[in-house]
Amino acid sequence: MSCQAFSADSFTTLAGDSLPLLMHHASAADCLPSSASTHTHNMVSAVPSGLSLLQSSKRSHMHLSTSTLGNALSNGPPGLHYPVTPCHYSNQQTTYGMMAAQEMLSASISQTRILQTCSVPHPNMVNGANTLQGSLAPCLYKFPEHGLGGGSCSLSHSFPPLPPAVLSEEPPLGGTKDLRLRSRPPDDPPDMDSPQIRELEKFANDFKLRRIKLGYTQTNVGEALAAVHGSEFSQTTICRFENLQLSFKNACTLKAILAKWLDEAEQAGALFNEKMGMNERKRKRRTTISLGAKEALERSFGEKIKPSSQEIVRMAEGLHLEKEVVRVWFCNRRQREKRVKTSLHHSSYLTKDSPTYR
């Protein structure tokens, strides 16, 4: 509220039921109407007792009670009714003990009017305060909260303590665990003469021999494993494993996978061979005919090139051979005789057509 000096010509006549205009002047007598001068004089007489109490206490924090002023004003004329609200300032350092009685009365009335004005906030101020509160929400420290009640006005400062996570200098438990895992040195590979290395070399050699026996190539194994375990398996991976060019950890991991695949491949190969053996026609073993039996069959072939079925049976019984063996021999002998006759006829034809030179 700004204070301005007015001349006597600037004042207008007020109605009787209107409130008096409160201005900041040198004294309360300049701003109060004449009808309240007597009432003010009676009210000031009660103030020195309170001043003596304040001067004797000599405290830095002052407690100003205006209950006496409120009672005095409540008994005044109806046109001069100023509701006085007691105020408590916890951080007030100014002492009003040395102020004059009239200036003290003017200051108390002015403060009462200001507090009444501040008790009803403007809508724009409320909206602005809400916006400011929303923008300052992420801050660690909150601004001081000012509470204005209906019967008292108190100013207090509240600063929430910092979170324990901010004040603590120790890393969280999760971070300590991760740090411990990261700082752990990697496992050293075993020596070249260790049992693990020898067992790995033996398995690599056995795997190569059994793979070749089953008829699989390194590419076939890589494609079969890639279809099940992913694209990290290829012909290069199998080749490096058989040549022991992988790291010990990767070789051990691949060993378990290859051992499982090898067992499945052998089982599948055994089943396949069994089915093929059942479906395949058995080939008869080759029959060996003695020289005496061949001479007897040659004589019979000279007599009759194509014997009957009964004659074949009698010859088979006489030579102690099977009927089918005798029949096949006569078929093969006729085919050979036919080839010999064809070749002789062709050679004689070439001899007749060729010219003779003398």
Curated annotation (Swiss-Prot):
Sorted alphabetically, the Gene Ontology BP terms of this entry are:
positive regulation of gene expression; positive regulation of transcription by RNA polymerase II
Give the organism the record lists: Oncorhynchus mykiss (Rainbow trout)
Q: What is known of its domains?
A: The 9aaTAD motif is a transactivation domain present in a large number of yeast and animal transcription factors.
Please note every region of biased composition (Basic and acidic residues).
177-187
> What main location does UniProt list?
nucleus
Looking at the record, the residues that make up the POU-specific domain are 192-266
* Family stated for the protein in its record: Belongs to the POU transcription factor family. Class-1 subfamily.
Q: Which InterPro entries match?
A: HD (IPR001356), Homeobox_CS (IPR017970), Homeodomain-like_sf (IPR009057), Lambda_DNA-bd_dom_sf (IPR010982), POU (IPR013847), POU_dom (IPR000327), POU_domain_TF (IPR050255)
- Region: Disordered, residue numbers: 164-195
**Name of this protein:** Pituitary-specific positive transcription factor 1
Function field: Transcription factor that activates growth hormone and prolactin genes. Specifically binds to the consensus sequence 5'-TAAAT-3'.
- What Gene Ontology cellular-component terms does the record carry? nucleus
Q: Which terms does the record give in the GO molecular function aspect?
A: core promoter sequence-specific DNA binding; DNA-binding transcription factor activity, RNA polymerase II-specific; RNA polymerase II cis-regulatory region sequence-specific DNA binding
Going by the UniProt record, its keywords in alphabetical order are: Activator, DNA-binding, Homeobox, Nucleus, Transcription, Transcription regulation
Q: Which residues bind DNA?
A: 282-341
